[in-house]
């Protein structure tokens, strides 16, 4: 009671085939399958893109090394004897 039996489903399927024809149903099925395949490809490419972004974010960021000031070597002039005398 209240449920759909197998006979009712077969009658509905027969009416649909008579209304649309087998060629139209076959093309609709192919279109539907292509849409589902495209949706799955888009979802997997988004997941791959997200995983790639996460991997790039996990990499340590290389910072520019600051240049340390270097002391120039200057030769110390020998003191002349004038100052000592």
Curated annotation (Swiss-Prot):
Alphabetized UniProt keyword annotations: Cell inner membrane, Cell membrane, Membrane, Protein transport, Translocation, Transmembrane, Transmembrane helix, Transport
Domain of life where this protein originates: Bacteria
Membrane topology: Single-pass membrane protein
Primary location group: membrane
Residues passing through the membrane, by range: 1-21
GO biological process per UniProt: protein transport by the Tat complex
UniProt cross-references to InterPro entries, sorted A to Z: TatA/B/E, TatA/E
Region (Disordered): 43-85
Comp. bias regions, Low complexity: 58-73
PANTHER family: SEC-INDEPENDENT PROTEIN TRANSLOCASE PROTEIN TATA
Subunit structure as annotated in this protein's UniProt entry: The Tat system comprises two distinct complexes: a TatABC complex, containing multiple copies of TatA, TatB and TatC subunits, and a separate TatA complex, containing only TatA subunits. Substrates initially bind to the TatABC complex, which probably triggers association of the separate TatA complex to form the active translocon.
Function: Part of the twin-arginine translocation (Tat) system that transports large folded proteins containing a characteristic twin-arginine motif in their signal peptide across membranes. TatA could form the protein-conducting channel of the Tat system.
NCBIfam families, per the entry: PRK02958.1 (NF002813), tatAE (TIGR01411)
Protein name: Sec-independent protein translocase protein TatA
Organism: Shewanella sp. (strain MR-4)
